[in-house]
């Protein structure tokens, strides 16, 4: 991809303080990406301050497969199943407003005989294996073990029911207890060799996670340069809080999926954002929902306005992500957008089109994807609409992005 100068330049009269040392990024980046990122730090960092309307320029990172390899939500779900920490609901339909009757019945058949409502299901035991398999299937494939559709009726741009369902299955535990579960899963997954598989029920699942050294270094240097660094993730809030400590991001700078609480314990309902009230369970940190939550938590925008693009001075200058779920908050970044290539259609269409010169693409740092052998279908089906209908990917001016060849791998 052609290099481009950051367009939102710092004021010409700003000069570096003579006693100020700008942090320097380590090597390990593709092409000129390190230079582009260093330029961002040099231009917006505290040694050459750029302050649109905040004390610090904002940088926002997705978490799973952006800062770490693999998914900490998955790691937590598998740990919960292996250790019998999911409490049986009285009615599985209460765990998600999008759960289909077929899925609720399959879960009840496999799980309900094993425990009383409100008590943990023994999914880590031989007698609980079928229950573990059913939960894992619904979570991992959005279908039952027999292939019945597990979720229906959701907005594809504001929520992913399976992601939310993990958070909802934490019902009955306190946030502190969930953080302890996440810490145990973290210890296991970081200690496991790369490529490890673990048994969950009668099946196997990914059993390892790694922090990306390059992203840890980038976050450290952004913070040292005076950036306000945030994490926006579609994994549960307490889980991401635990993992984010490993890159020096504190809990008050983590925006994950958030449950409502009752008597200090998590419920099956979710906090809302923008025009979506708490308990409506339809606006999580997912695609357009990430914009809403970032606007709300980082920039203090309240009400329906949080769902809208904000003026440049009230947006992040930098964003990093790896998936179509990140595309909206990446587009909102005003200076630079880092994409880790996982062959996701809409995201790669926009990144390779690079219509404003602010996108940079990097292969995954561990086990990078091979080159996609066919072009990304930008002009036909690369975009997923609110109702799930595929459509062309369009630029801000509504022109259609042509199909793109995969060139960074």
Label for each model-derived stretch:
Residues 73, 80, 88-205:
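A metal-dependent, Asp-based hydrolase signature
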Residues 13-14, 124, 371:
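Residue-level signal for mature regions of secreted extracellular proteins and peptides
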Residues 2-7, 11-63, 71, 76-107, ...:
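Non-catalytic pre-domain segments flanking phosphatase-related domains
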Residues 4-13, 116-117, 361-366:
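Short, intrinsically disordered, charge-biased short linear motifs at domain edges
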Residues 45-49, 84, 115, 140, ...:
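Short, flexible coil/linker elements and helix-boundary hinge sites characteristic
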């Amino acid at each position: 991809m052609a290099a481009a100068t950051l367009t939102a330049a710092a004021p010409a009269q700003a000069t570096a303080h003579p006693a100020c040392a700008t942090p320097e990024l380590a090597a390990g980046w593709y092409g000129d990406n390190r230079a582009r990122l260093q330029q961002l730090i040099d231009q917006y960092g505290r040694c050459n301050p750029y302050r649109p309307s905040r004390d610090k320029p904002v940088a926002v990172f997705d978490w799973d497969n952006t800062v770490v390899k693999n998914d900490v939500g998955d790691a937590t779900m598998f740990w919960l199943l292996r250790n019998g920490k999911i409490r049986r609901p009285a009615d599985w339909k209460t765990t998600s407003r999008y759960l289909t009757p077929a899925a609720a019945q399959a879960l009840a058949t496999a799980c309900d005989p094993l425990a009383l409502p409100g008590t943990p299901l023994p999914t880590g035991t031989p007698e609980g294996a079928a229950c573990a398999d059913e939960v894992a299937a619904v979570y991992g494939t959005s279908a039952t073990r027999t292939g019945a559709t597990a979720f229906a009726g959701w907005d594809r741009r504001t929520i992913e029911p399976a992601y939310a369902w993990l958070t909802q299955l934490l019902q009955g535990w306190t946030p502190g207890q969930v953080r302890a579960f996440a810490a145990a899963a973290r210890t296991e997954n970081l200690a496991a060799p790369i490529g490890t598989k673990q048994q969950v029920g009668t099946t196997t699942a990914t059993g390892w996670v790694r922090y990306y050294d390059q992203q840890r270094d980038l976050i450290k240097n952004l913070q040292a340069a005076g950036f306000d660094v945030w994490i926006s993730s579609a994994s549960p809030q307490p889980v991401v809080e635990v993992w984010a400590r490993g890159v020096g991001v504190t809990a008050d700078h983590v925006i994950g999926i958030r449950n409502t609480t009752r008597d200090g314990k998590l419920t099956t309902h979710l906090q809302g954002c923008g025009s979506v009230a708490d308990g409506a369970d339809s606006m999580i940190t997912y695609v357009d929902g990430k914009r809403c939550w970032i606007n709300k938590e980082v920039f203090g925008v309240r009400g329906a306005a949080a769902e809208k693009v904000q003026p440049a001075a009230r947006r992040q200058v930098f964003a990093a992500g790896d998936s179509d779920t990140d595309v909206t908050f990446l587009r909102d970044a005003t200076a630079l957008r880092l994409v880790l290539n996982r062959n996701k259609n809409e995201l790669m269409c926009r990144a390779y089109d690079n219509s404003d010169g602010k996108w940079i693409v990097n292969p995954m740092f561990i086990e990078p994807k091979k080159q996609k052998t066919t072009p990304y279908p930008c002009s036909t089906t690369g975009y997923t609409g609110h109702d799930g209908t595929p459509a062309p990917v369009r630029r801000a001016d509504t022109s259609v992005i042509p199909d793109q060849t995969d060139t960074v791998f």
